[in-house]
């Protein structure tokens, strides 16, 4: 298992939906730090910000292979996009690490904003082929599949 958490765009350009994949030891926490539920945001509008605290371990308590609807926000709690998050906990993922996929709207501006937030919160940009490399190194696929 690799210690660094990586993030990268996992889908092609031009579609209405883009997928950003995050993999590694801290994938759940990195995404948890920028993901908010609709309920949380509506409570945030009703009460003082100091009274409501988001816990970045939100995904730690969730089952693997589950889908979560919500929003990606920046550090000022401004919504960047409405998203679907797919959670795949290790070892039952492509890389055999914790993997989170963010399904976001396809515009380049939004995708870059979300990717920058992930990098700001501890991920690093994945190198080309790095998700497949991790799958190979962790025994998920063999050399002929890589």
Spans of features found by a protein language model:
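A glycine-rich (often HGG/GG-containing) alpha/beta subdomain
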Residues: 1-146
